[in-house]
Amino acid sequence: MTSRTRVTWPSPPRPLPVPAAAAVAFGAKGTDPAEARSSRGIEEAGPRAHGRAGREPERRRSRQQRRGGLQARRSTLLKTCARARATAPGAMKMVAPWTRFYSNSCCLCCHVRTGTILLGVWYLIINAVVLLILLSALADPDQYNFSSSELGGDFEFMDDANMCIAIAISLLMILICAMATYGAYKQRAAWIIPFFCYQIFDFALNMLVAITVLIYPNSIQEYIRQLPPNFPYRDDVMSVNPTCLVLIILLFISIILTFKGYLISCVWNCYRYINGRNSSDVLVYVTSNDTTVLLPPYDDATVNGAAKEPPPPYVSA
């Protein structure tokens, strides 16, 4: 009985890859260089593409974080600008103690600008009438000539030199009132300053009169005695008690000073209104370095720069 034994021959070894140059030398068809480069690029791009795909969520996350950071910085800058514009006028202006008395309205519920125009026109009319009277008196002295008996002794009413001075003062007052009216109408604050200075000077003179009456009450009696005998109500005033006369005169001067002070405040408020209207608003700009805002973080820039690798080198056949 014969037994069969199975003999297994070893498989032939796998042929080694022949280099392209040797294959061409022996007449075999070698691999195309372009195909070799493309296959090698695909083999090398496999891990690289896998790495890029793995880093894609991280890049997207960093891009979203960078975009969110830019939006947060932009909103912060806008809020800072708005807050600076809101607080800049109050912070840059010096608040004076008399600011609480500032108002845009005056008597008869009219605007301070309208009140200043009316006040300037009123003073202009009064000084024009005074100027006409003085000019007519200078042209015809006999019309305003008073005899010594009418004036009560050696009392000279007004000579030519005083008349010329009064005419010059009236002309100056007409010019000042016209400037104030024009400045209030055309909203030019500098034109109102001379009229305001005149009001301050007039107020100071009235204050000096009040102080003189308060310190020297007997001067009133002496002044009344110097008046002509035919002066209206001269004897009635002389018969009044000196103390009561002083109190009446002080009360009258106080009313005049209060009224003049109110007119001064109206003109001053008009000046402030026109000056504030013509002055440009203060703009506050919050500047920042735009390059630091727009540039990405350093880590993201280095990661993105490392991801962009150069293409594989060209291999000649």
Curated annotation (Swiss-Prot):
GO biological process, one term: endosome organization
Membrane topology value: Multi-pass membrane protein
Keyword Transmembrane helix recorded: yes
InterPro entries in the cross-refs: LAPTM4/5, LAPTM_transporter
Source domain of life: Eukaryota
Family: Belongs to the LAPTM4/LAPTM5 transporter family.
Protein name as annotated: Lysosomal-associated transmembrane protein 4B
Species: Homo sapiens (Human)
High-level lineage: Eukaryota, Metazoa, Chordata, Craniata, Vertebrata
Gene name of the record: LAPTM4B
